[in-house]
Amino acid sequence: MFFFLQLLVPIISVFQSKKHYYSTFIRCSISNRRPEYVPSKISDPKYVRIFDTTLRDGEQSPGATMTTKEKLDVARQLAKLGVDIIEAGFPASSEADFESVKLIAEEIGNNTDENGFVPVICGLSRCNKSDIDKAWEAVKYAKKPRVHTFIATSEIHMKYKLKMSREQVVEKARSMVAYARSLGCEDVEFSPEDAGRSDREFLYDILGEVIKAGATTLNIPDTVGYTVPSEFGQLITDIKANTPGIENVIISTHCQNDLGLSTANTLAGACAGARQLEVTINGIGERAGNASLEEVVMALKCRGEQVLGGLYTGINTQHIVPSSKMVEEYSGLQVQPHKAIVGANAFAHESGIHQDGMLKHKDTYEIISPDDVGLSRSNEAGIVLGKLSGRHALKSKMLELGYDIDGKELEDLFWRFKSVAEKKKKITDDDLIALMSDEVLQPNVYWKLGDVQIMCGSLGLSTATVKLINTDGQEHIACSVGTGPVDAAYKAVDLIVKVPITLLEYSMNAVTEGIDAIASTRVSICSIDRHTIMNGSTGQTIHRTFSGTGADMDVVISSVRAYIGALNKMLSYEKLVSRYSKPEDSVVV
């Protein structure tokens, strides 16, 4: 980290004075200022737009496939978080993705909050008419629609992937931006893919041409995470100084994390003049991921006034942790404990010296309050639930935790809660969140777990008998043997559902401490015979993967619930795809 700060010093030095740099620590402040949205300009030069691409770039992570319902839930949460632009997907990649983007544009893109805020809804497209038509058709229903189009500009991409000359690439970019504007889209973003490795003079030329064609935002991607902060900051500075018409558009950054520099590069870009930052929740994305929303936003919030030129965002940071947990749950990508801001250990202090300092004054070792990001310090405050608690108390507690549930969802959760409360003396917030995830935040249910019976030991193979219930209420029972109780149970499930499934990942952790802790299981599956897609950048064939989670005090039941959850997500995806295309159709992403 010290190395990163050294790299940032030349860039941020213009903003800081010795007085600020060595000033006493000041608690992070919350800013609610948000300038009126105009596509190509921002009235306050210190305001930075946050462009979230969790639903597009983030979902390209292996195992991160989300259902339409899950995407809508995430989009709603992003709107609560206050992100300026939601990149809802890549409409041309499949009809299923097109429908998801369209639904988000229709619902989230028209839901104005009490402050008059409604996010921009953006769809990605390659530089061709059919992609742009699809993107516009999907997002045009939003109050603030945007089309984001891209083409590669580095020599290696133009020569080997596009097989196009510089002149052809410039003309394609110019004409397609103009075409997007001709459809009636007044907000067009252009990205020169692999800008970090592109020739500077060529970059200035193509950016100048798309500005003349009507682009309102120019996104500068470090597509392979190759640059370092001083280098990326200089790139933004050079683009500002040498691109004709640059004063009439917004400069954006999109930094990948291949060298672990995405957050540092993003901040360097902001200090150099970028006023839109492209990020994802938890930093998820292809390969090593993207710049993390929570890291970028909290860095600006905590250090913006002192060393980052007063830059600020419109993010409601108290929704960061709920957003992180939702994306973690739906994507199946577990946040590592030491992850900055949202990791389980982010606010934990084990060292005796640190604990002593914290007890005397929290600011000794804590630069961010857990409350700033929506994390309660303790489960002890507020309503305490037990086996005698009723539905009203449960509903109130879940509302306190950020979950507004009613009707069947509340009823289903209540009976799971009562079942656990009979066996467990103390129900913690983490227990409730795990049960909520397992009982309510699940995809459409095609198969539901009825019963599981296990026989195992050291004398022979484990045996599992599993009862599943389908959507018609019919019970199906199968028995199988395996190398362990979980393996036997999974094989019994396979005998019932008759779908070829490959288990890719399996993990389990205790939600809380103690012998009576709830076990939370995560699995990732794929079907080798189907769901084959092609990566548009690499041309590689990829098997779409599906994740599931389960929670129970019994580790085998928790494991089976997770497996069935992943299976239901896969079947939901199959049903959605079958509405629009033949099962054998491949998808380009």
UniProtKB/Swiss-Prot annotation:
GO terms under biological process: L-leucine biosynthetic process
Gene name, Swiss-Prot/TrEMBL: IPMSA
InterPro entries in alphabetical order: 2-IPM_HCS-like, 2-isopropylmalate_synth_dimer, AIPM/Hcit_synth_CS, Aldolase_TIM, LeuA/HCS_post-cat, LeuA_allosteric_dom_sf, LeuA_bact_synth, PYR_CT
Pfam families, per the entry: HCS_D2, HMGL-like, LeuA_dimer
Xref: SMART domains: LeuA_dimer
Organism: Solanum pennellii (Tomato)
Official protein name in the record: 2-isopropylmalate synthase A
Enzyme class: transferase
SUPFAM superfamilies: 2-isopropylmalate synthase LeuA, allosteric (dimerisation) domain, Aldolase
Entry binding sites for a divalent metal cation: 57, 254, 290
